[in-house]
């Protein structure tokens, strides 16, 4: 299963640098000079291999220079490209209460009282911490802080995320 670790937001300057939105918790290991990246063009386009020439932080994103991308025109052509890794290549997680995003996505969300709320659509990484974006059967989105006080139990074996929501968290009105 392919996992997105970054996405090209736009070109930066005239020398081929790219502004990359990071979608991995370990950018220092994935986006380093000499690293090989697998990229896929937007809307199911062709895959292509890239080699990182340089990288530097840029306001919560990265400025990336790739081998063979030497000017703004080449950089603009990569807008929307996503960088991928295969989930089988990820190291196992040693901590019992830590998960890869893809392990949580699709799990059933149920309250401690046994009420089904919906399914985890995605995990959002914010400055304040992680949020579970839960899609209800009606199609609404509920954002659940992914903290032990609200999410006391995750069972990958049972395909279940159990939540103990504070008053008002599940109110959609």
UniProtKB/Swiss-Prot annotation:
Alphabetical GO biological process terms: ribosomal small subunit biogenesis; rRNA processing
Record key words, sorted: Chaperone, Cytoplasm, Ribosome biogenesis, rRNA processing
Domain PRC barrel per the UniProt entry, residue ranges: 96-169
Domain of life assignment: Bacteria
SUPFAM superfamilies: PRC-barrel domain (SSF50346), Translation proteins (SSF50447)
GO molecular function: ribosome binding
Transferase found in the keyword field: no
Cellular localisation: Cytoplasm
Keyword Transport: no
Any Pfam family hit: PRC_RimM
InterPro entries given in the database record: PRC_barrel-like_sf, PRC_RimM, RimM, RimM_N, RimM_N_sf, Transl_B-barrel_sf
Biological function: An accessory protein needed during the final step in the assembly of 30S ribosomal subunit, possibly for assembly of the head region. Essential for efficient processing of 16S rRNA. May be needed both before and after RbfA during the maturation of 16S rRNA. It has affinity for free ribosomal 30S subunits but not for 70S ribosomes.
Protein family per UniProt: Belongs to the RimM family.
Subunit comment: Binds ribosomal protein uS19.
PANTHER family in UniProt: RIBOSOME MATURATION FACTOR RIMM
Domain-level remarks: The PRC barrel domain binds ribosomal protein uS19.
Name this protein carries in UniProt: Ribosome maturation factor RimM
Source organism: Mycobacterium sp. (strain KMS)
This protein's encoding gene: rimM
């Amino acid at each position: 299963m392919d996992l997105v670790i970054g996405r090209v937001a736009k070109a930066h300057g005239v020398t081929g640098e790219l502004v990359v939105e990071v979608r991995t918790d370990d950018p220092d290991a994935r986006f380093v000079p000499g690293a090989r990246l697998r990229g896929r063009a937007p809307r199911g386009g062709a895959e292509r291999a890239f080699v990182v020439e340089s990288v530097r932080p840029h306001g919560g994103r990265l400025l990336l220079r790739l081998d063979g991308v030497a000017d703004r025109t080449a950089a603009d052509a990569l807008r929307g490209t996503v960088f991928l890794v295969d989930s089988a290549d990820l190291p196992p997680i040693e901590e019992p209460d830590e998960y890869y995003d893809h392990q949580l996505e699709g799990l059933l969300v149920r309250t401690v009282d046994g009420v089904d709320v919906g399914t985890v659509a995605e995990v959002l990484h914010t400055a304040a911490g992680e949020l579970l974006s839960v899609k209800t059967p009606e199609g609404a989105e509920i954002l659940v802080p992914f903290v032990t006080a609200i999410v006391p139990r995750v069972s990958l074996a049972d395909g279940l995320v159990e939540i103990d929501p504070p008053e008002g968290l599940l109110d959609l009105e």
